[in-house]
Amino acid sequence: MSSSRSQSPETPKAASEEREEEEKESSEQPDTPKTSSEKSASRSQSPRESREVSQETETSENQEKIKEKDDGDDQPGTPNSYRSRETSPAPKRSKETRESESPEKSPVRSRSPRRSSARSPSRSPRRRRERSSERKQSEEPAPLPEKKKKEPLDILRTRTGGAYIPPAKLRLMQQQISDKQSEQYQRMNWERMKKKIHGLVNRVNAKNLVQIVRELLQENVIRSKGLLCRDIIQAQAFSPGFSNVYAALAAVINSKFPHVGELLLRRLIVQFKRSFRRNDRGVTVNVIKFIAHLINQQVAHEVLALEIMILMLEEPTDDSVEVAIAFLKECGAKLLEIAPAALNSVYDRLRAILMETERSENALDRRIQYMIETAMQIRKDKFAAYPAVIEDLDLIEEEDQIIHTLNLEDAVDPENGLNVFKLDPEFEKNEEVYEEIRKEIIGNADISDEDGGDELDDEEEGSDVEEAPKKTTEIIDNTDQNLTAFRREVYLTMQSSLDYQEAAHKLLKMKIPDSMQNELCAMLVDCCAQQRTYERFYGMLIERFCRLRLEYQQYFEKLCQDTYSTIHRIDITKLRNLARLIAHLLSTDAIDWKILADMKMTEEDTTSSGRIYIKYIFNELVEAMGMVKLHSRVTDPTLAHCFVGLFPRTNPNSARFSINFFTMIGLGGLTLELREWLAKGLKKKKGMLDQLKAESSSDSSSSSDSSDSSDSSDSDDSSDSSSDSSSSSESEPEPPKKKKKKNSEESSKKKEKENIGRRDRGDKRAERHRDQSVENKDKDRRRRQDSDENRRPERGDDRKDRSKDRRRQDSDDEDRKGRERREDSGERRRGDRDRRDRNKDQEDHREDRRDRSKDREDRRDRRRHDSDDDRKTRRDRSEERGGRRREVESDDRRRRR
C-alpha cells in the first residue's frame, strides 16, 4: 500500500479504469462460484486494506464528478442546476446501464475489496497501461456534444433588474423594438414608468403640487396605480411631516381616478391593522396621520375615523391613547365641522379614561394624562393650531370630491400583485384609451420633464417630418408662485449689493418683464417702509429708476398718491419712512410735484395721520432744499396747481386753518402770500359791506327827496301858469315881441336858481339821513357788542380761531405723542419679553447641557467602576486558576516522587 500511495496523480484514474475492466470481464464470464482459496483470501484481508480500497473508490468517483462539472461549465449563460444530460459531455456508463445494454443478462458477481488488494502492486501499472490501450483501440470515439449558441441576456429579467441604463439609451432600445405587444417593450416601458413615478413623488411639495400632478398624468396611472400607491405610502413613511402634501396629491388623483384613491386607502387600512396587531407604535402613528389627512381631503369617510377611535379607546393603553390623540390632532378640525356629535362622544370617552386613571391604581403614564389634557385644550381652542386643510393644498372643489366609504373590516386585499409587471395583450388599445382620458383632463399640452433622461434628443427635434402645430392651453397660476419667486430674487439681489448703483445694475440685468415693473416699484417702496429707520439706500435706488425710464417715474407717482389715500392705515414708523422717501424724491425732482395736488389742508379733508405725514414731508423738504428754495417752489406760478389744496384760497376758514397749521410746524414763511390774500379779501369784503350800506342809505334818502321836489315843482308850475295866463290876457290886443323875449330869459334864470337851491337842500337832507342811518347802525353794533352772545370783533375772532387751532393742534400732537409713547412702551415690553424668553431658553439650554454633562460623568463613573470590578474579577479568576495550576503541578510532582 505504501508503494501505491507513492504513485503519480494518475493512479486513482488508472485504478478506476482497471476496476471497470474487471467488471466488464466479470459481466462477460458466466457466474461461477468462488473457490475456497478466494474465499480464504477475502477472509484474510485486513480491515485496513478494505478501508484503503474504499478510499480509492471514493476518490475516483469524486474525480469523475469534478470532470463532469468542468465539462458542464463550458456552456455559458446556463446555470448548473438547469443543465441537462444532452448539453453536457457524455458521461461514463454506469454498471446498471451496461447491464441493461448487454444482450444476455448474466448475474453480476460482486467484487470483493480483498481480491483487488491481493494483486501485486508492482505489475499493476503495466497491466493498466496495456488494458487502457486495448480499451482505447476497441472503443469508438464518442461524438462531441453540440454547443448551444449563446443567447443575449435580457437585462430586465435579472434578479436586480440589471445594471443602470441611462434614460436616453433605454429610450433608444425601446425605439428599436418595433412590436409594442412584445414582452420586452412592455417591460422596458414598465421600468421607465416606475422610475419616473418614484422621482416625481419624491419631489412633490406644496408649491409644485399642480405641476407634479400634471407630470404624473402623462404616464398611464391606470396601469401603474400599484406603483403609484406604493411610492406615495413609502414617501409618507419616510417624511410624516409632509402627510398633508401627499394627501393632497392623492385627493387630486382620486378626483379623476377614484379606483387609485380606493386602492391607496385600502392599503393604508391593511397596513394599519398589521402594525396595530404587532404593537408597532411608530408605523401606526405614521399611517394614522396619513389616514387623517385623507379624511380632511374628503377621500375617506368620517366613519373610518370613528371606527379607529373606538378601536383605540375600547381598551385604553398608553400606546393606544397616544395614537388616538395624534389622530385627533390631525383630523379633529374636520370632525368638528362635519360630525360634532361624534367628536363630543370621543372626548367624553377620553374624559372618562382620565377620571378612571385618577381613581384606579393601574393608572396611565403621567405623560399620557398630560396629552389628554392638552387635547382638551386644543378642542377648546377649536383646533386653531391644527387646521384641516391649509390654503395652498385646498385644490379640489367640493362637487369634484369622491369619498370612499371603506371601513376596517372591508379592507382585506391590498392587491400587491399590481406592483409587479404583467404582460398586457391589448397594450396599444389600452394606451390609446388612456391617451383620450388624459386629453380630456389636462388637454394636449405636454409637459417636458426636468430630468435629462426625459428630454427629447436633438435628432428627434431635427427630424425631416414636420408636425402640425398643436394647440396649447394657457395655464393660469393662481398660487402666486412666480410672484413670490420674483420678490425673493429682487430682495436677495438688493441685500447682496454694496451700494444702490450696484443694486440698480443687477436689477436691470434681470430683464424684468413689463408686467412685473409695477411689482418691482411696489416692492422697493415696501422695503423702504419696513425698515426700522429710513435708509438713504432705497431713496437713491428709487431716484435712479425714476431717472432711467418714464414708466418707473409714473409707477412711483401713482404709489405716492395711493399712499396718501390710505395713510390712516399705516403705523407711525412706516409713515415716517415713506414721508422721508417722498421728500427725497421731490427735492431731487425725481418725481413730479403734482402728487401734492391730492392733499387738502382743511379741517374736513384731513386726519391726524395725514397732517403728521404732511408735516414730515415739509420738514424734510426744508432740510433738503432750504426755506428760500422751497418758498420759491411754492410760489412758482407753473406749480400753482400742485399747492391748491395745501394753501386753499377759496374759503377764508380753510385758508386760516392752513396758515395756523404751517405756523404751528414752524413753516409760517410759506404762508405769506396766503396771509396777504386773506387780508385783501377781508378789506375787499369790508369795502363791499360799506358800499352796500351806502347804497341802501342813498336809496332811502333819494326816495324822500324825490317826493319833496315833486311837490314844489307842482306849485311853481301852477303859479307860473297863472301869471302867464294873466299877462297873456292883458296883452292880447297888442303883444309886444321884444318884451316877451326878455321875460322868457328871466324866467329861465329864475328856474335854474330855484333848482340849484332845491338840489342843495336835498343834499343836506340826504346827508342828514345818511348820518342818522350810520348812527343807528353804530347803535345796533354797540348793542350787539354789549351782548355776551354776539360779541365778535374781527381781531378777537382771529385770535379765537388761532387759539382753537392751537388747542386742536396741541391735542393732536398730544395724541400722537401718546400713541408713540404707547407704541414705544409696547415695543419695549415686547423686547423685554423676548429678552426674558431668550434668557430663559439660554438657561434651559445651559441646564440641559449641565444635565447631559452630568449624565456623561455618571456613565463614565459607572463605566470606570464596572471596568474596575471587571479587572478585579479577572484578577481573582487568574489567581484562582494560578492556584489550581500550582496545586495540580504539586500533585504531579508528588506522584512522580
From Swiss-Prot:
One of its GO terms (cellular component) is nuclear speck. It comes from the Eukaryota. Residues 194-382 form the MIF4G domain. Signal peptide: none annotated. Residues 1-10 have a biased composition (Polar residues). Residues 485-601 form the MI domain. Residues 1-155, 444-472, 689-897 are annotated as: Disordered. Expressed in germ cells, oocytes, and sperm cells. The keyword Membrane does not apply. GO terms for biological process: cell differentiation; gastrulation; germ-line stem cell division; mRNA splicing, via spliceosome. InterPro entries: ARM-type_fold (IPR016024), CWC22_splicing_factor (IPR050781), Initiation_fac_eIF4g_MI (IPR003891), MIF4G-like_typ-3 (IPR003890). Required for pre-mRNA splicing and for exon-junction complex (EJC) assembly. Hinders EIF4A3 from non-specifically binding RNA and escorts it to the splicing machinery to promote EJC assembly on mature mRNAs. Through its role in EJC assembly, required for nonsense-mediated mRNA decay. Plays a role in the nuclear retention of unspliced mRNAs. Plays a role in sex determination. Required for early embryogenesis and tissue differentiation. This is Pre-mRNA-splicing factor CWC22 homolog. It comes from Caenorhabditis elegans. The gene is let-858.
